[in-house]
Swiss-Prot record:
Signal peptide: none annotated. Keywords: Antiport, Cell membrane, Membrane, Symport, Transmembrane, Transmembrane helix, Transport. It catalyses: (S)-lactate(in) + (S)-malate(out) = (S)-lactate(out) + (S)-malate(in); (R)-lactate(in) + (S)-malate(out) = (R)-lactate(out) + (S)-malate(in); glycolate(in) + (S)-malate(out) = glycolate(out) + (S)-malate(in). This is Malate transporter MleP. Belongs to the 2-hydroxycarboxylate transporter (2-HCT) (TC 2.A.24) family. GO terms for molecular function: antiporter activity; organic anion transmembrane transporter activity; symporter activity. It is found in: Cell membrane. Secondary transporter involved in malolactic fermentation. Catalyzes the uptake of divalent malate into the cell coupled to the exit of monovalent lactate, a product of malate degradation (precursor/product exchange). The malate/lactate exchange is electrogenic and results in the generation of a membrane potential. Is highly selective for the S-enantiomer of malate. In the absence of lactate, MleP can also catalyze the proton-dependent transport of malate.
């Protein structure tokens, strides 16, 4: 009994946490759960922290299968698949995550700004010069590998690259295959955007699952090797790796939040004039330039880092729960499951992982981080997938590079998608 009282879930005592869970169950059964910011935040944060806690307690899950992060994703996905969570709540979570509410934008704004501004300037510039070329070369290698394997197994080069490789590298659902399906539909004589979207979605979903498994495996297998940078892409001095201790200040956290949101809006403004480039990509470029030129005052940098710490600590598990509940559709995945499809998806993930690993050694980067950041991330489903992949491999500090690779490669996929759909069909 004493041990139960001392048990804490994310710093919250077990009796108090049980009260939160009981309230959510009762209000959901009564059909009175508010499908707004209050109700959905309570649901996702409580569910996310609970599933993470359970996952961390399972020995095999904790040691070999990604622990709490992967368990949160799997657990939430199964709750949705078996209709344990009502469908109207799932729909509301979907809107909350990426629709009208933009909860993911809130989270990713904090993540990108905090990770870039909190990084050592020299380290950021040094790593970026080598990482971006590796991500692009890896993408080209992955594209042709999937096409060639497709030819060998009777799936054809065109169908393999256009319906497996391209969607896997497109950057997810919203910013990836939604515009890609529109581009395909416009390029085909009798193209139907909805039908094409349903053909592209399984590759994105399954590719994301394989990317999570791949990132987790790389991190585990090479944990104690010389190839592991422990979250850092390039070899660095102690001074470059040193993270200053920051004392949280309520007013500064508010300032950091406003600055992060303003930079996201600046990305929106640029996206208005260049709609083919995602707002996140513009945001990364802006923050990168500000950091590289030492434009942001130290106290403002610290404010953004504080905001990042608060959001990361309290909302990461909630985001993973939301991804599992609303964004991973096992029915869609099952409908496309053929052995050829599995082989092609595996080819993309394995080849891109190996290519980025060897390119990292050639360019002088840590292979573990590069294989995760350029290989696995380029097969994930965009912002949500990046979070899932990096969380599973305990590399969340790499979010800026992940978004950079994802958005850059995603934009290239959209451009070439419009050209190749007319060329092949």
């Amino acid at each position: 009994m004493k041990k139960l009282k001392e048990t804490k879930i994310s710093g919250i005592s077990l009796p108090l946490y049980a009260f939160f869970v009981a309230v959510i169950i009762v209000v959901t059964l009564l059909g009175k759960l508010p499908l707004d910011m209050v109700g959905l935040t309570l649901l996702l944060v409580t569910l996310g922290h609970l599933l993470y806690f359970i996952g961390e307690k399972f020995p095999i899950m904790n040691s070999y299968l990604g622990g709490g992060s992967v368990f949160t994703l799997i657990g939430a996905t199964l709750l949705s698949f078996f209709h344990i969570v009502p469908s109207n709540v799932i729909g509301a979570v979907s809107n909350f995550m990426g629709g009208k509410f933009g909860f993911l934008d809130f989270y990713i704004a904090a993540l990108i700004c905090g990770s870039i501004l909190g990084m050592n300037r020299n380290l950021l510039v040094k790593a970026s010069k080598k990482f971006i070329p590796i991500a692009l070369i890896t993408m080209v290698i992955g594209f042709f590998s999937v096409g060639l394997v497709g030819m060998l197994i009777g799936n054809g080069f065109a169908d393999s690259v256009m319906y497996v490789s391209m969607p896997m590298m497109s950057g997810g659902m919203g910013a990836g295959i939604t515009p890609l399906s529109q581009i395909y539909a416009a390029g085909l004589a009798h193209g139907n955007q909805a039908a094409i979207f349903s053909q592209l979605a399984p590759a994105v979903t399954f590719g994301n699952i394989l990317a999570i498994i791949g990132a987790l495996s790389i991190a585990k297998v090479f944990n104690k090797s010389k190839y592991n940078g422990h979250g850092t892409l390039v070899a660095a001095t102690k001074e470059e790796l040193a993270k200053p201790k920051i004392k949280l200040d309520a007013q500064q956290i508010g300032t950091g939040m406003l600055f992060a949101f303003a930079l996201l809006m600046a990305g929106d403004i640029l996206n208005k004039f260049f709609p083919n480039i995602h707002q996140y990509a513009f945001m990364i470029i802006i923050v990168f330039i500000l950091k590289a030129t030492n434009t942001v005052p130290k106290d403002l940098e610290e404010s953004v880092v504080m905001f990042n710490q608060v959001i990361m600590t309290n909302l990461t598990h909630a985001v993973l729960a939301g991804i599992g509940l609303a964004l991973i559709d096992l029915n869609t995945l099952a409908s496309a499951f053929t052995w050829q499809f599995v082989v092609l998806c595996l080819t993309s993930v394995v080849v891109m992982g190996l290519a980025s690993w060897f390119l990292a050694r050639l360019f002088g980067l840590y292979p573990v981080e590069t294989a995760i950041g350029a290989g696995m991330i380029n097969n994930s489903m965009g912002g949500t997938g990046n979070i899932a992949v990096l969380s599973a491999s305990d590399r969340m500090e790499m979010i800026a590079f992940a978004q950079m690779a994802n958005r850059l490669c995603g934009a290239i996929v959209l451009i070439f998608g419009g050209i190749l759909i007319r060329f092949f069909y």
